C-alpha cells in the first residue's frame, strides 16, 4: 500500500452552475461576493497563475504515481477534493472553483485507490464513488462545529471498511 501525499491545487475547472469558463465563474463569484481569499493572498510564484501551478503539480504527481513500484494500491491524500462530487454540498456553489481540478476525477480508479482523504470543504463525511471510500477529514472552524458539540474527530483509514 502506498500512501501518496499529493499537494495538488485547483484550476477553476469546478465551474459554478451556469458557467463554462474560469472567467465566467470568477465573474459570478465576484458579483455574488463569494470570493476565496486565495485570490488576494495565495501568490502562484514561480508560476504566472494558480491554474498553471495546478497543471504543473498534477503532471508531476501523475508521473510519480504512474511510476509507483509494482502498481501498488494507494491511499490518495490531498488538501482539495479529487472529484467534483463533494462540492455539490457547498452552501455557496460559486466557491467550488477553488476546490480542486477535473484533471484528477478518475485518479481513484486509475491509481487503484483504497481510500481518498481530503479536506478543504469543512464538511466532514464519508462518501463512496465507484466503490472507493472518500473521507473529508477537515476540522473546520469553531463557528462551524460548535453547533454540533465539537469537531468530528479522527477517522480510521486503514483497515478499510467495505461499502454498504
Identify the role of each PLM range.
Residues 2-5, 134-136:
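Short hydrophobic-aromatic micro-motifs
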Residues 88-90, 94-114, 121-164:
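Binuclear metal-dependent phosphoesterase catalytic core
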Residues 4-75, 82-91:
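Active-site-proximal loop/helix segment associated with metal-binding centers of metalloenzymes
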Residues 75-82, 114-124:
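Histidine-centered catalytic micro-motifs
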Residues 1, 27-29, 37-43, 110-116, ...:
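Low-complexity, flexible helical/coil segments
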Residues 7-9, 80, 119-122, 139-141:
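Active-site metal-binding loops of divalent metal-dependent hydrolases
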Residues 1-2, 73-75, 115, 144:
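Structural motif
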Residues 15, 43, 79, 108, ...:
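Histidine (H) residue identity feature
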